[in-house]
């Protein structure tokens, strides 16, 4: 493949003004892999909340111009000969989409060490939806020192990350209590914002995984922890105050821990080593993708409109697809 061949990509030329979407479809040269790198033909690439934040100038470490996108599924077409033709999927910490060109393009370069075989029972669209949600979920649980005997309270259990947290925790043997704004979970925060029903279900909670980042709800969740409990959170409010107040006596008397989790601190190789360990779980049906919330979009102005919908708090999981898969 020659360098002068071109591809379509969703790209930022410069840092957007605050709150403005700074992406556009451009034609750029297809990148060429160096030693130790692979060229992947992207078949599908999910749009994550962090992609939206990046596309609106929300990160200080993005280097411009830059192709956006962290998650992907596709086929290796150039690089190590034993991997050419392999279907792969993956994700990234603060490299793809930030300091290296990302996955919202027809082709992308990844390190050979970061290549992960795609689960055989997933479509490209499904596989592209796994990366950020499942690695973030694993990180939140592991940083929360979660054990198989723990009772885990999952705030935002119906979201992409929350659903992944529930599946992983249950696979580890934990008892899971689900929390959301919906009546389909154990606790509905619309009618029980203080999470009082927790005590009807269990005596205490060992771990809280908060995927929402609402200060008042986070405080309510913290109050449910027993001695030695851990609260692990992955998000903060996008608007309004980002301050969180807590009872200092409660923290030290109950020996509690409050832990922040940021998947962007993982390297490409570290992120994908987590995914590699999950492949068998997907193939065994223990981990599943939330298909009902996925909507496919194309690498045209349509995907830019999908970004705009996400700016308006749309809960759909958009996946950019390059062809039928």
Curated annotation (Swiss-Prot):
SUPFAM superfamilies: GroES-like, NAD(P)-binding Rossmann-fold domains. Keywords: Cytoplasm, Nucleus, Oxidoreductase. It holds the Pfam family ADH_zinc_N. It is found in: Cytoplasm; Nucleus. One of its GO terms (cellular component) is cytoplasm. GO terms for molecular function: oxidoreductase activity, acting on the CH-OH group of donors, NAD or NADP as acceptor. Its EC number is 1.-.-.-. It is an enzyme of class 1 (oxidoreductase). Belongs to the zinc-containing alcohol dehydrogenase family. Quinone oxidoreductase subfamily. This is Zinc-type alcohol dehydrogenase-like protein C337.11. It comes from Schizosaccharomyces pombe (strain 972 / ATCC 24843). The lineage of its organism: Eukaryota, Fungi, Dikarya, Ascomycota, Taphrinomycotina.
């Amino acid at each position: 493949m020659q360098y002068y061949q071109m591809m379509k990509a969703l790209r930022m030329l410069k840092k957007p003004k605050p709150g403005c979407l700074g992406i556009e479809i451009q034609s750029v040269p297809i990148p060429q892999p160096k030693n130790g790198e692979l060229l992947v033909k992207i078949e599908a690439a999910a749009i994550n909340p962090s992609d939206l934040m990046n596309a609106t100038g929300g990160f200080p470490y993005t280097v411009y111009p830059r192709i956006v996108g962290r998650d992907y599924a596709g086929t290796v077409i150039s690089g190590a000969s034993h991997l050419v033709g392999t279907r792969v999927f993956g994700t990234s910490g603060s490299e793809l989409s930030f300091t290296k060109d990302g996955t919202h393009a027809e082709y992308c370069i990844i390190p050979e060490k970061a290549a992960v075989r795609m689960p055989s029972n997933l479509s490209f669209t499904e596989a592209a939806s796994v990366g950020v949600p499942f690695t973030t979920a694993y990180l939140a649980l592991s940083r929360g020192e979660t054990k198989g005997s723990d009772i885990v309270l999952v705030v935002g259990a119906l979201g992409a990350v929350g659903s992944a947290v529930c599946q992983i925790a249950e696979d580890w043997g934990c008892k899971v209590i689900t929390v959301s704004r919906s009546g389909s979970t154990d606790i509905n925060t619309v009618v029980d914002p203080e999470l009082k029903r927790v005590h009807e279900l269990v005596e205490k909670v060992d771990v809280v995984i908060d995927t929402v980042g609402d200060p008042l709800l986070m405080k309510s969740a913290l109050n449910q922890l027993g001695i030695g409990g851990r609260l692990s959170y992955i998000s903060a409010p996008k608007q309004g105050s980002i301050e969180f107040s807590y009872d200092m006596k409660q923290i030290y008397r109950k020996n509690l821990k409050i832990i922040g989790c940021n998947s962007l601190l993982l390297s490409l190789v570290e992120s994908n080593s987590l995914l590699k360990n999950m492949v068998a779980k997907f193939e065994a049906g223990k981990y599943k993708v939330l298909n009902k919330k996925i909507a496919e979009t194309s690498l045209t102005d349509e995907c830019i409109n999908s970004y705009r919908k996400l700016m308006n708090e749309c809960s759909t999981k958009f996946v950019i697809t390059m062809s039928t898969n």
